[in-house]
Amino acid sequence: MNKLSRRQLSIGAGAGLLLAPFVAMLKEGPTRAATTKTAKRLLVFCTMGTKPDSWKPTGISGESISAWSAMTQPLSAIKDSVVLVEGCPAGNPGDGHGSPEGLTGQGNGYYAVNNVQQLAISVDQFVADKLKKAGINRPLSSLVLGADTSGGVTMSYRAGKAVAPIASPSSAFSTAFGAVSSGGGGGTMTGGGTMTTPDAALKRRQSILDLVSSEINTVRGRVGSIEKAKLDAHLDSIRALESKLTASTGGGSTGGGSNPDAIKACAGLAKPSDAAGTHPAIANDLLHMDILVNALACDITRVGVIQFGTDQGLQVDLPNLQGDQHNGFIHSGAGENFKSLIAFEAWLATQYANLITSLKSKPDPDGGGGSLYDSTLVVWARDMGDAVNHDMKDMRFVLAGGAGGYLKQAAGGRYVNAGGGASNRHERVLLNVLEAMGVTDYTGFGDPGFSGKSPLPGIAAT
């Protein structure tokens, strides 16, 4: 493979986003080895709380998992990657609905330093700010996506207020990839999560790949056969995502947050009998996950969030499983021994595992021969610990990804129980996330009065 100088390699700004992993291979100079075990990318998977006794693995020996619960069984497919964490109360363990504490470390209440209020900021937004301050500027500092999120409280926060996720997949695609057709930044979002300048290429059913075909051909002609196959797979995934979006919108309209045809959006997902009226949340969130992975792969952002519903509800329409997660599966589930909740939690675990698999299929945007998985930390976080009883006495996380070698992982999966107690509050796991992303100054994050402000032991590899 021939190395090219930046002058010789004429790639426009927009094309450079799509081709980031392969342009990195061609630029002059060797890839710098990482000096510390840190991740470069963060992907947060946000859901409601769960039922703790149904979530916990059924076979545990020390930190080893020998048998998985029905809820977590799908995670066994990626067991070498995952670390399950529980036994961490929130700072305000009695908080329930509407508390911002899940990703911020601040519950309901007033937090101040020297009589100056410290407004809540979630771990994803704090990381995004720190990366920008460190000079790691990308078209989007973060990308927060999620369907069916307007009827309650979501988990990403900035300046004490919840960050509204982008609900429409086509708006999300325009936000992330609009720069390809414009050659510049990623567009401007309005407060409601829609684009002021939607991606014209998608609207015309024209692939963004066609707009940069000459640059694609330039790169294809310079990489070796192995890299060429990876390039084709990378571009095929973007084209497939475009096809799903144009099919789901019936022409690519980017307005609004609805998708009236969930079967077209995600074939085989919705019930054929009521496809015309089915709720699109699940189908849209699957598209959102595809968009996030591709945005990370193209180095359009370093921080992504997928939010499934809110603290008040998520409409589920899957084969043999329909209803509202909150009022139905959680609060009306005792009569069926929480069968529907267990089934939906297993479905969520499957999607989390699929994210890991998808990251492994993408080349690292920084080059070096690794995968996107190698440089990404994937965090499954929840708004509450015990959703049935509405409390935060025992928060739980799933951590996975190569994360630059930060995580202490095991062949059969690792289980960490912090043991409870105020000193082991869940904010410490959020500090692990910051540490994994190379952030060691926690000023301005979490509870300023927490005396044990350090990452939880046992998460990081030594």
Residue ranges of predicted features:
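Ligand-binding pockets and gating/stacking loops
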Residues: 1-462
